[in-house]
Every structure is written in C-alpha cells, then in structure tokens.
Amino acid sequence: MDWKKYGYNTRALHAGYEPPEQATGSRAVPIYQTTSYVFRDSDHAARLFALEEPGFIYTRIGNPTVSVLEERIAALEEGVGALAVASGQAAITYAILNIAGPGDEIVSGSALYGGTYNLFRHTLYKKSGIIVKFVDETDPKNIEEAITEKTKAVYLETIGNPGLTVPDFEAIAEIAHRHGVPLIVDNTVAPYIFRPFEHGADIVVYSATKFIGGHGTSIGGLIVDSGKFDWTNGKFPELVEPDPSYHGVSYVETFKEAAYIAKCRTQLLRDLGSCMSPFNAFLFILGLETLSLRMKKHCENALKIVEFLKSHPAVSWVNYPIAEGNKTRENALKYLKEGYGAIVTFGVKGGKEAGKKFIDSLTLISHLANIGDARTLAIHPASTTHQQLTEEEQLKTGVTPDMIRLSVGIEDVEDIIADLDQALRKSQEG
C-alpha cells in the first residue's frame, strides 16, 4: 500500500501491517518469537539465500514483527527502508561502519550525547581506524572546513544533548552534498516534531529506547534510509562493486535506491548480530501508535516548566531550544514546527553541591540515566552521562558543572512544577 497519501497518525497506526495477519485475523501485530522459518522447499531456500526473493531465514537478519516496525518507521519518515537493531548505540555504529573504514573520516557536530562522543572519539578509531573530526556545528562553515577527500559522512544531532543547539540542516546538507557525502542525523529527541528527510538528511538514526518507546521498557535502535543519496559518485565502492561475502552482489545494482539499508542488513547485521528482539519490536510498535500525542504533551509541559524555572530564585540560568539566550534559537523556530522537545537544562545556584542536593530532594521526578520516558526524569550530566569526558570535552558538548538536565514527562504539569519547586528550595538551605 502507498502510505504517502495518509497522514502521520494513520501511518503510525497502520503502516507495515495490512491486512490483518492472514492465519488468525489478528488486528494487533503478532509477536513472532522464533529463531527461524520453515522453507517451502529446497528451491525456495536457495532463492532466499541468493536474495532473489524476499522472506525470512533467521531472526538475526529478519523477523516478521521486527519487519512491521521497520516498515512503519520508514513510512513515517518517508524513506525507502529501515533497519531495527538492538540499541541506539548499535544504530549509530552500523550507520557509520556501513560506509566508512580504516583511514576514512567523519565530520561530526560536537554537541553530542556522551555515549556517542565516546564512540566517535575512542572506540571507532581504536577498533576501526575511523577518524571523527568534531566541530562547532552551529556555524556551517566549520563543517565545510573540516571536510577532506577522506570524509565519508557528516553527522548531526537534531537537538544537541544536552546543549540543546539546533543546526542549520539545509545549509549543512548543501555543503555535505556538494562534497559528495551523506548527511546522517540522529533524531532521537525529536521524532514527529522534526522530519530530517524534508531538510536534506540522507540517513536518520534513532535510539528507539527514548521517545519512540516512550515508557522506559525497551532498548532498541533504528536506521532509516531516505533512498535519495547517489552512492555511485565514486566515494563508496563497497556499495557499487561486487561484495565477495555475499555471492558478489552489487548493492546498488540489486537494491537500487535501497542499497544502503540493504547492505546494512545483509552485511553488518548478519556479521555483527545486534538484532532487535521481537518482543521489543512489539513494544516499539505500540509506542509509535501514540508518539504524536505524547510528543505534543511533552513539548507543552516543557514550555510551561521553562517559564517556571526562568523566574525561580534558586535558578541561575535556563536553556531550551527557543530560549532567548540559545544561539541557535532561529534554527529551532525554523525547523521544529510541531514543538521544541522535552529536554530542558538549567543551573542551580550554588553549583555542583546545590545541584546534588536538588537531585536528592526530588520526590515525584525520577533520578536516572534516560530521556524520553512518559515520566519526568532528572540527572546531573557532568557526574553521570558525560562523566567519562574531560572537563574541556564536557564544555565542548555543552555540559557545565552546575547543569541539571530534565526530560519532561506527560504528568500533570502542576505536579511536576511542585516537585521542582520544593527540591529547588531545599537546594538553597544551609
């Protein structure tokens, strides 16, 4: 079915699963908790292994429940295909390894989640020989100056976590494409409220663990392929030339515009094995069904909390994508048309010790290392999520010693504010 004629919410409820499962008529997507699938005959098995016919062989590389999730997120993003993997970190890693190898370079914005920064700064280089150059992405000129003949991709986060900066996607996409490389965007914190493919992105990655799942129950990642990038421009021979590990297949010739995502599945997922479990896929499918409703409430609550914090005597500063002091405010207003996200950061007067006292005084808000839960969450990034970074590296990613990060939930906003207020007051007590 052509899902492009349907609205976002209709696709979120129906795409990838129509008509209802033939054998039973199940309206809900069934959980196919199986490792493998019976072939009809020897010829059928041979065709599947030769990639001559779509179908399922082994759950490590494909599963009917997981496939529904992949088709649904591809429909929502209006891409040609998607791959579900075991975590957001796996999604980011595969997205890079699919097109880069030893000696290649990636140009990345510096406003990154701490786990991504560590992956790029240390693990990718030490294990794969891939060099990541970090630049201040708030000025597109920095991106262009960092690109060389060895560059294989430009990487951005939609809203830097926790710096909350928003890049000029269209300007950066133009630069990347002029140099013959794709733009990869991590849209984890902005599903529904930002559509990366509409603004020049070629590949989108998600930690589905966050807002897509929405309830803090499951770990998973997603890679979505726009199908618009020209992989035949001479910079990506692995997508064009025969793959000796898979019968000499040329991904571009065989899969056309879906070459990137097909290679990611048949090569990386097959060999590295970070597959998503069918049960987690089922939970993410449920999450997609209410994603837009939750994101609207997250954003609505966040705006009210920003206003509360701005006037609180125990707060020294507040940051949000459209805050007056945020240097990329105009980009947020330009690109984020359905809301400005659920992440709010602020400083508690009294610095690190006062911040610790604030965290320990919360009663309703949960202190934990996650974002995107339906419940409101709080953390002190400098001592937790970004602890492995040096103080200089923390500052480059937007983390200050006094920073508190809130992931605003969908509770009654008055209750969230009441908990913030009492904890802030206690943080100032001698």
Curated annotation (Swiss-Prot):
Its EC number is 2.5.1.-. Its cofactor is pyridoxal 5'-phosphate. The modification N6-(pyridoxal phosphate)lysine is found at residue 210. InterPro entries: Cys/Met-Metab_PyrdxlP-dep_enz, Cys_met_metab_PP, OAc-hSer/O-AcSer_sulfhydrylase, PyrdxlP-dep_Trfase, PyrdxlP-dep_Trfase_major, PyrdxlP-dep_Trfase_small. It comes from the Bacteria. It is an enzyme of class 2 (transferase). Keywords: Amino-acid biosynthesis, Methionine biosynthesis, Pyridoxal phosphate, Transferase. Pfam families: Cys_Met_Meta_PP (PF01053). Gene3D superfamilies: Aspartate Aminotransferase, domain 1, Type I PLP-dependent aspartate aminotransferase-like (Major domain). The keyword Amino-acid biosynthesis applies. Catalyzes the production of homocysteine from O-acetylhomoserine (OAH) and hydrogen sulfide (H2S), a step in the methionine biosynthesis pathway. Is not able to form cystathionine from O-acetylhomoserine and L-cysteine. Belongs to the trans-sulfuration enzymes family. NCBIfam families: OAH_OAS_sulfhy. This is O-acetyl-L-homoserine sulfhydrylase.
